[in-house]
C-alpha cells in the first residue's frame, strides 16, 4: 500500500546536474542556469481562467504494476471567488481523511487527501485507474459527511494534530454544502465539470 508521502501532484523535477561531479569543482554561470532549468509541472498547465468547481483527473502515475489516480476536487472558482481560509480547509481535511480511511470500498485504496496550496480545493489520490465519473458518488458521500457532521472534529487535539486550534467546523459545513450543489447538478452545466477545460 502506498503511503501518504507519495505526492505526485507536486511534480518535483531535479536538475540534470544532480549528482554530477565536475573535475574543476565549478561550473560556469551559463552552465549553472542551463542545468537548473526545470519543466513546468502539469498542474500549472491547466487554464485556471476557465477552470470551474468540479471533479477532475489531475494525473495518473504508474507505480510498479499499479496506477495511482490524482483527482482535483476544485471547490471554488480560481481567481474569481475568495479562497478558503485555512481553518475550514483544515477541518475538511480531518473529516475527509477520516471518512475516506474508513470507507468500506475505498478505505484501502486511499493514498492521500489534502488541501491545495492555492486554497481553492483538495487533492485526492486513489490506488487504481479511475475517471471522474467513477468516484463522483464517493465525493458526494464524503462532502455529505462533512456537511452533516456534528461534534468534535476527529484528531482536533494537541496530542493528535500540530495545529489543532486552527479549525472551523461551521464554515467547513457551509463550504461542503456549497460544493454539493455543484456535485449533485454536475451534468447541468454548459461546460464539463468532470474534464479539465481546453
Where are these regions (language model features)?
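Short hydrophobic targeting helices and cationic amphipathic motifs
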Residues: 7-10, 15
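Non-catalytic terminal extensions that flank enzyme cores
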Residues: 34-79, 193-197
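Short secondary-structure junctions
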Residues: 103-107
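Active/ligand-binding-proximal structured segments within catalytic/core domains
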Residues: 68-102, 112-113
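Histidine-acidic residue clusters that define the catalytic metal-binding segment
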Residues: 181-198
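Active-site-adjacent, His/Asp/Glu-enriched structural segments that form or flank metal-binding
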Residues: 113-185
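Short, Lys/Arg-enriched N-terminal segments with co-localized hydrophobic residues
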Residues: 20-37
Amino acid at each position: 500500500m502506498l503511503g501518504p508521502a507519495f505526492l505526485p501532484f507536486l511534480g518535483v523535477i531535479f536538475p540534470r546536474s544532480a549528482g554530477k561531479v565536475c573535475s574543476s569543482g565549478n561550473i560556469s554561470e551559463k552552465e549553472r542556469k542551463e542545468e537548473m532549468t526545470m519543466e513546468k509541472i502539469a498542474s500549472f498547465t491547466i487554464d485556471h481562467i476557465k477552470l470551474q468547481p468540479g471533479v477532475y483527473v489531475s494525473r495518473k502515475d504508474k507505480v510498479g504494476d499499479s496506477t495511482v489516480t490524482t483527482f482535483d476536487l476544485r471547490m471554488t472558482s480560481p481567481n474569481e471567488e475568495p479562497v478558503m481560509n485555512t481553518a475550514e480547509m483544515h477541518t475538511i481535511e480531518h473529516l475527509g481523511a477520516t471518512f475516506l480511511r474508513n470507507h468500506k470500498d475505498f478505505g484501502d485504496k486511499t493514498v492521500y487527501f489534502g488541501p491545495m496550496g492555492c486554497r481553492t480545493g483538495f487533492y485526492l489520490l486513489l490506488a487504481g485507474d479511475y475517471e471522474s465519473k467513477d468516484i463522483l458518488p464517493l465525493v458526494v458521500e464524503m462532502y455529505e459527511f462533512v456537511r452533516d457532521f456534528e461534534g468534535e472534529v476527529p484528531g482536533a487535539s494537541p496530542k493528535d494534530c500540530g495545529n489543532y486550534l486552527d479549525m472551523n467546523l461551521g464554515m467547513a459545513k457551509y463550504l461542503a454544502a456549497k460544493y454539493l450543489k455543484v456535485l449533485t447538478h454536475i451534468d447541468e452545466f454548459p461546460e464539463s465539470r468532470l474534464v479539465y477545460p481546453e
